[in-house]
Structure formats: C-alpha cells, structure tokens
Amino acid sequence: MQKAIRLNDGHVVSLGLLAQRDGTRKGYLSKRSSDNPKWQTKWFALLQNLLFYFESDSSSRPSGLYLLEGSICKRMPSPKRGTSSKESDKQHHYFTVNFSNDSQKSLELRTDDSKDCDEWVAAIARASYKILATEHEALMQKYLHLLQVVETEKTVAKQLRQQLEDGEVEIERLKAEIANLIKDNERIQSNQLVAPEDEDSDIKKIKKVQSFLRGWLCRRKWKNIIQDYIRSPHADSMRKRNQVVFSMLEAEAEYVQQLHILVNNFLRPLRMAASSKKPPITHDDVSSIFLNSETIMFLHQIFYQGLKARIASWPTLVLADLFDILLPMLNIYQEFVRNHQYSLQILAHCKQNRDFDKLLKQYEAKPDCEERTLETFLTYPMFQIPRYILTLHELLAHTPHEHVERNSLDYAKSKLEELSRVMHDEVSETENIRKNLAIERMITEGCEILLDTSQTFVRQGSLIQVPMSEKGKINKGRLGSLSLKKEGERQCFLFSKHLIICTRGSGSKLHLTKNGVISLIDCTLLDDPENMDDDGKGQEVDHLDFKIWVEPKDSPPFTVILVASSRQEKAAWTSDIIQCVDNIRCNGLMMNAFEENSKVTVPQMIKSDASLYCDDVDIRFSKTMNSCKVLQIRYASVERLLERLTDLRFLSIDFLNTFLHSYRVFTDAVVVLDKLISIYKKPITAIPARSLELLFSSSHNTKLLYGDAPKSPRASRKFSSPPPLAIGTSSPVRRRKLSLNIPIITGGKALELASLGCPSDGYTNIHSPISPFGKTTLDTSKLCVASSLTRTPEEIDMTTLEESSGFRKPTSDILKEESDDDQSDVDDTEVSPPTPKSFRNRITQEFPLFNYNSGIMMTCRDLMDSNRSPLSATSAFAIATAGANESPANKEIYRRMSLANTGYSSDQRNIDKEFVIRRAATNRVLNVLRHWVTKHSQDFETDDLLKYKVICFLEEVMHDPDLLPQERKAAANIMRTLTQEEITENHSMLDELLLMTEGVKTEPFENHSAMEIAEQLTLLDHLVFKSIPYEEFFGQGWMKADKNERTPYIMKTTRHFNHISNLIASEILRNEEVSARASTIEKWVAVADICRCLHNYNAVLEITSSINRSAIFRLKKTWLKVSKQTKSLFDKLQKLVSSDGRFKNLRETLRNCDPPCVPYLGMYLTDLAFLEEGTPNYTEDGLVNFSKMRMISHIIREIRQFQQTTYKIEPQPKVTQYLVDETFVLDDESLYEASLRIEPKLPT
C-alpha cells in the first residue's frame, strides 16, 4: 500500500483562510465527485493556482483543495434533464476542470448564472504559475528595455545639457559683441552734424502696408510660377521619366535575384556534383549549359548598385553613363545568346541521365526557385536586353531633345537593338526545346521521346477518348454525358513525330495513358471511324469523332478513337495530324522517289539546291531545322516565302501554320491565292531549276540544261486534253527499277492514287458521309499494296523469299474515305481492325492500282526497311502489280505513276514525271486551301471577293478532265466547307446573350448568389474573349491612335474589363453601412474564388484589381469588418494573378489547367508588345522577319487554344443584365469622391 503524501495541515489551513479573504474569485458552486454522483453545493475560493472549497462562506477551515497547475477548464453543454427531476425548471451552466493526470477524473462544477460560469472559467484558465512566470519574464524584458532607454535618454540629456551650456556661452559672447556694435553705432550717429527729422506716423503706416503688399505679391507670383510648372508638359514628362526609372530599379532588382538563383542554386551545386566520385554531369557540360552566367550576374550586380546610387541622388538622375558601362560588356551577352540553343540541347541530353534528372529536380524544388525550372532561368537573360530597349524607348519619349543625356541614350538604344535582334531569333529558335522540356516535366512518368530536340510542338488540347468497347454506340447524348467526359477526357499533345495522350491527375500532373505515346510513322487517320450507314446516326455524332489506327513495329495494332468538342477543333486536329504524318513519311520515303538508273533521288535534289541552306540577298536561315529537316527561315522576301509554301518537295506543318497566321502582315490573301492558282496551272514552276535538271536528267537524256524546264504540251494543264495512252505490256518476270512511293514528295499530302483501288468488302467501318471538315486531300499513308490475283511461279518464289527474309506483312495503311457510290456496299456488321487475311478477298474498284490477294502488305516503314534488303521495294511493286486489271487506261496510270525506265523512251519518261509533278502540285494546292479554309474561315467570311475567287478556282479544278477522282472529291469537300451557311458562332452567341437581356429589369446585387454571378461572368468573359479575331494581335493596333478602328474587339474586351471592375467598386461603395460594405467585399471575393475554380482568371483579376483600387483599399473601417478568412483568400487570389515575373504564377497555372479557360488578355498583349517593340517586321534590306512571325504565331496558337473550347453554362438573363447594366456604374473620379464621402480623410 502506497503511503499518503504528507502536507503541512496548518499551512494549508492558513492558505485557505487567505483565499477566503483575498481570493481572486469566490462564490458558491455545485460540484460532483466520482464517489458521490449527487451535486453538492460548496463555497469555493480561488487563490493563485489553488482552489479551496468550504462548507459555507463562514467556515473557518477548508473542506478540500485542488491544485490547478497544468489543468484545463472549459464549459460543457448541459445534460438532458428528466421530466421528473425536481430541478427541471431551473437552468444550470456546467464547466469542468481536467487535470493532466489521466488517472485523475475531471472536476465537474455548475452555476446558476451564465455570466458567473464564464467568469469562473476565465479565472481558472488564468490560474497558472507558468502563465505568471511567462508574464513576469516579459515584464522583466520590458523593464530591462526601459532601463536601456532611460540610460540612453540620460546620455542624450547630458549631451543636450552640454550643448545648452555651450550655447549659453556663445550667446553671452554674441550679446557682448552686439553691445559693442550698438555703442559704436551710437557714437557714429552722435557725431553726425545734421540729425534726421522724425517721420510722420502715417508715413510709417503706409510704408508698413507697402512692405506687406510687396511680400504678398512676391509670394503669390512665386506660387503661380510653381503651379504653372507643375501643370506644364515638362513637369509631367519628368514625373513619368522618374516613374520609368523607379520601375527600372524594381525590374533590375528582380533580374539580379533571378541570376543569383541561377548561379547559387544550379551552377555552383552542379560544379560540385561534377567533381564528385560518380559525377552525374561533366564539367564540360556544366560550362556549356551555364556559359557566362556567373559573369552576367556580376555585371548586373554592378549595374544595379550604380542604379541605386543614381536613385539616391534624386531628383538629379543621370543614367547615360550607366549604359556606357554596360555597352562594352555586350560581347559577353552575345556569347551567351549564341550558346543558348546549344545550352538547352545539352540540358535535354543530360536529362536523359536519371541521376542528373533526379538531382536537378531536387535543385528546382528549393523554395527560392518558386517551382520554376532551370530552362526558365536560362531564358531570363534573353529577355533582359529587350526590356532595356523598352525602358530606353520610354525614357527617350519623356526626355527633352535638348536634354544632356539625349544623345547618349539614343546611342545606347541603337546598340542594344542590334543585340536584341539576334536575341529574338535565338529565343524563337529555342522556344520549341523549352516547350518540349516543359511538357516533359508535367508528365509524372516522364517522356524520353520529348528530350529529342528535333521534335517540333504543333498543338495541344482536350479531347475525349472513347473506349473501343463503346464503338458504334456513340451518340450525341452519350458524348455530352458527364461520366464519359470525366472518364474519357484526355490531354493530347501533338508533335512532329509523336502524339502524346495523357490524363490529368491530382496537383495538375499528367499521367501517360496506356499506349499514350504514339509514333506518327505508325499511324493512319480515319476521319469518320464509326460505321454510319444511315444518315440519322451520322447526324447524332455530328462528325466530331475521328479514329487513329496505330500499327507499332513490335506490338499488336490498336485503335484510338478521339472526340473533339466542335467541328472546327476536329478539323484543326485532323489537318495537323495528317500533315505531320505526311511530313515524317515523306522524309523517310524520299530515298525511293524518282529513283532511276542515274540514282537521282529527292535528297539529292534538296542537297543540290543551295537556296535551301545558303543565305542570299533575299533569304537568310537560322541554325534550327524544321519538321522536314530543312533549315528554318529567319528572314526572307515575300516571293521566297511563297516559293517555300508551294515547294513540292516538302511542307512543314510549323511553316504552314505560321504563314497562314501572319501572311496579312507582309502580303494579302489575293497574292497568296494567285500564287496557288499559278502553281496549279503551271506545276513545273514549283520545283527549282537545279532540281528539275537532276530530275529529268538520266544516262540517256542530257538535253535539259540548267534552269530549263522540259518542254511539253502537258507542262501547262489548263484546257489540255489527255494525250494518247501508250499501251504496252511488260512481263512480271522483268523486274523494273520502280519506286513504290508513287507520289512526288508533296510536303503535306502525297497522292492517294493507290487508295482508289481499295474495296469496301473487308472493312466496314471506313465508310461515312463526307464531312465538310473531313480529310479532303490525298495521303501517302493510304497505300494498298498487294500482288495480283494470279501469280507466276517466279512470283511465288519471290513471295517465299520475302517471307523467309523476315519481312513484316502487317496490315497496311488503308483507304479511309470511299466515294459516295461505294456506300451502298457497306456491311452492317462490325469487324475488328483488318488483318492481312481480311483483305485477300477484296475486289478492286474504279482504278485497281494494287490488289490484295497474295497477302503481301507493306507499310511505309516496311518500305523504308526493305531498301536495305536484297529484294527492293520496286521489285515487290512489280510482283504485286503483275496481274492487275488489264484495262489500257489503268495500265497507263500504273506505268506513269511508277516512273518506269525500262522499255520506254526518255521523252515518255519525262512526260510521266510531269504527270506526277502535276499530281503533286494539285495536292499541294488543295492541301493549303484545306488548311486555310478550315483553320482561318474568317478570312473568307469577311472578304467576299476572296471567297468568290476561291469558289471559281475550285469549280475550275473540279471541271479539269485530267483530275483524279480523289482530287475531285478533295476539291468538292473544300467547296462544301466554304459555301455552307454557318452563322459566325463567336459573335452570334454574344449577341444572342445580350439580346436575351433586353427588357429584363435589373435586380439588385443581393438577389443573385455568388455562384450565379460567377457562372454568368465566366460565360460573358469567355464570349467576349472568344470573339477576338487573331489578326488583331498583329502590329500593336491596340496601342495606336486609331485603335478602335484597327482592333475593335480587343478594345471591346478592355472596355468590358474596366466596366466589370467599376461595377464591383460601385457596388461596394453603394452601401452606406460599414457591415454591408464588408459583406459585399466578402461576396465578391467568393465570386472570384468560384471563377478561379471555373478557370476564369480574367474575372479573378477583374475582381482583385477592383478591390485593390485606392477608392476601396483606403476604407480602413470597412476592412476591419472583413473576416480573416476572406482576407487570406483575397491574398491568395492576388498572388495567383500578380504581374510579378511576367505573370509567372498565372502562366504556370494556365500551363497546368485544362480548357475551357479564360486567361487574362493583357498578359498576351504584353508579350506581343514585347516582341513588336524589340524587333521590326522588316529588316533594313526589306526582308520579312519570319522568326518574329513564328514567335507571334506561337502566342496566337495558345490564345486560340483557349478560344476554341466553350463553357457549358446556361445563360441567366437576370444575372447577365445586372453584369452589363451601366446605369449605376461610377467612373474613377466619382468612385473616389464617394469613398471620401463615406470615410473622409483624417486631418494631418
């Protein structure tokens, strides 16, 4: 048995009496113990951390004691009272004291008064020695601090006393000196012979008034001079100039901080890592990545310190000498600029090392980096010189011509502009690498194929992936279902070589789907994948889906079905995918095109053409290759750009998109159309003379000289009639050297002549009504290659040889579109993707160029692989076509398209080559028109003359007797797209929404919920943003004097932004009560947070900027009533849309969010102004700055990505009417006056 703890009973009794007399809290309480569940009334007294209780207030000895140190006191709810209880009519208030010891039960107490209960709880909560000790320590600290202050004050007082004493001595000395001077003056005056007469008192008064008036007039004149100067243009320019300098100081401080992070967080740690035992990176690679970075940091630290010193001497600001220090160091920047592309390439290569990639992610995770990547920090110096140029432009705009710094600033600007042009080119050329690395970093699993610096980013967006199990069950209702959209929504990224399909996970991270990395060389696009044999079904899906058939080299084939949100978006995706597939296949198939005994191939045609890689007076190239492995154009004349557009040997998707976006800057649509028409009518002019010489030359034909085109009645196609077909036969045993790649390289769309012979029996899913946005041109990806119905023994031997040589015979890329006449033969049953066996029973139709019967089926990749085998692809072609349809017309087409040498004269072969060139020219013209019509339809909606000319041209094409059926079908689809009556969706939806509000009474703000306002504001913002045509983004029209005429929709967006901002401020100031204003602020902040969830970042900035304006921000009494949660949320929203670091937080959020989305337009306008100010549209030689056009096109591409995806929000006219009503909206001056009226300024 444990012994009881002994206490000094007498001392406890004395403390109890002391508590009874001097306790901090005394009174009757009811307590309940564990031994006795009944409530007992006792008299309690609290002394420090001791709680005594007595039988009554007159007891001389306490009944018990509780030590409260470390206990917790809190109120507890009243227990339910029984109806039979005697005390049921009396209200009690309970609280408990919990002790730190778990074994000790809590003390339960109750009172009859709620206020008394609260006071007991508060008193017991403060009854702790620890609290007293803490307060005592704080008081001691204050006491020591006061002692130090007193000592300091004593010292100061002593010094002041000493100064006073010294002052008194000095005063006494001065008094004595004055007294002496007075005596001397009196002596001099007494010696004067004539004493002045006393002046009249009136004269003295007059002189005094005159003196007062002279002083008043002088002060008034001086005040007027000061006021006139303050209002003068010179003073206004100086104020703006000072503001520019202060902004420059802030930007320079931020830039120095960025360089400091680059050097200290990346460069120096990587140098140490390179010296480790197992280095993840070499010293050479570190030097290549960070060339001159440390030197640039030191240079700008010196520049920043000099700038701070100039600011310290304000208002005298001399800046020219600072730039004189910077200019001689520009060679350091030049080395950094020239190395920039190589730096990012080395970085991409190093990131393939897992150890380096892991280490780099650790560095980037540091708080200083703020989730920015190394590529971002390496790009910051590229933007600094253009920023200096903009600053100098503003300084010169506010610097008088006679200013002492004018000439120096002009000289600095000219030198910086020379370097800026080079920098813009380098940024343009490395933008693709940085974009690829940014996307690769967003994918959680990583994606090594994006580390290939030759990949070119084309487009991205959200598509819905439909599982194959639902094939044939897709309808409009199912496509719009939330479950399918949530489960099937995919983030798709199209590159020049691959299609990446991802899902969006938590934290905005991307995850690759199964088979999410698709190589485009293995792809075949089916425009309408569903088996829609009845019109009703086709109308249900609205032609929004398309199918990609993938046939990997080392895995079974599979199919991906994707659904776009609109027909326009589908047209853009399918056009770009087809273009990329053609580009990559044409690059691989070049080795066989026009292959003859003279071994003249298309690569030789390109290599022999110096105009494709050598600078000339009318063209200059960058170091970067485009998607067709041809040098990108940096500067070029308009004529050379049009030549590149119509060059039949290649056409890169990035050049085509940039050209169609920007051609209005340097030419007009009629010139482009005329060039396409001329190429169609005279296709031989689309190939340079040197390439023509190589093409038409052979061992038997040397008649063509350099620069001479072959003379033939077929060289000009208009009104030409087909020549007599040369009928000839050749034995299948004679294996001519043929090119299986029938078409010339058209760059975008190779001929699909082979697809004309593909029947419909074996593949029922390929037939669909012709979509106006469907694929309309011809494609090398649609080749059907097979042997004849009957084979000779030698053919069988060749087939056996092919099989024994390990040739793959997978399903080939087959025809995706059939003529309308074939649709009646469609089988209703679904079949799996076709196999070689499923094609063997096909019967050729129309032009059976190739038949599937022998089982020989080769994809384009197989054909390239076969070039390295003993059996050439051309031999396989001869075997495959040996027993084809024997009609003379078909045999002549085979012979022409195969460009056979054996058995035909050189003149006949030249005619065959011209035939292929005409086919390629036709496809090029139709391909460019298809991209133009589907992606840039507004060009034709706003220009009736252009539309008329295109329609006339297409009608002429369709009536050409030499036109092939697939070409005629392509032209018909373009015509259908161009002539169909479609309402301009962008403007009509906004007009309809505003029309719905007519006659609707404006309801007050309180009648609308935050959710309703956020949704309707998002819908309104999106429609206004969507209505901006992309041509307004060129030329900085929004900053010109005639901005309302040049960019009406951008200005409409700006006015809408300002209207909503003024509406919010007016709504807050409309309330007279402080609490009402605070609740209005809280509600608008809630609206902003909902808009953030809806990805409407424009509205977030509208609301935060409105609340941040001085008329609202100065309302201190109102802000005291706003809750802490609202203030915290407001700060979070402000940080999201902050302009710091060129809107770095907003850019990162946009990069990780899925459309629909409404970005802040001003961010993109700043980027475009940055590009426009830094570089001109034309060089001094009059060449178009195509690198600049490429960068602007990339910005427009991102804007259009957000414009294309719409919100599924139902309009609410009442809420919309409230948002657009301008009746009660105040302007800036009225808002500030209302703010002063509500809370006047405090007197100073």
UniProtKB/Swiss-Prot annotation:
UniProt keyword annotation of Phosphoprotein present: yes
Q: Which residues form the IQ domain?
A: 204-229
Q: Which residues form the Ras-GEF domain?
A: 1009-1241
Listed under GO cellular component are:
apical dendrite; apicolateral plasma membrane; basolateral plasma membrane; cytosol; glutamatergic synapse; growth cone; neuronal cell body; plasma membrane
Compositionally biased intervals (Acidic residues): 818-830
As for PTM, the annotation reads: Phosphorylated by PLK2, leading to ubiquitination and degradation by the proteasome. Ubiquitinated and degraded following phosphorylation by PLK2.
**Domain DH residue range list:** 240-426
Q: Where is the PH domain?
A: 22-129, 456-582
Entry-linked PROSITE patterns: DH_1, DH_2, IQ, PH_DOMAIN, RASGEF, RASGEF_CAT, RASGEF_NTER
Region feature Disordered, mapped onto this chain: 707-730, 800-840
Task: Tell me, in a sentence or two, what this protein's role is.
Answer: Promotes the exchange of Ras-bound GDP by GTP.
Quaternary assembly:
Homooligomer and heterooligomer with RASGRF2. Interacts with USP8, thereby regulating its stability.
Domain remarks in the entry?
The DH (DBL-homology) domain mediates interaction with RASGRF2.
Question: Under which name does UniProt file this protein?
Answer: Ras-specific guanine nucleotide-releasing factor 1
Look up and give the organism this protein is from.
Answer: Rattus norvegicus (Rat)
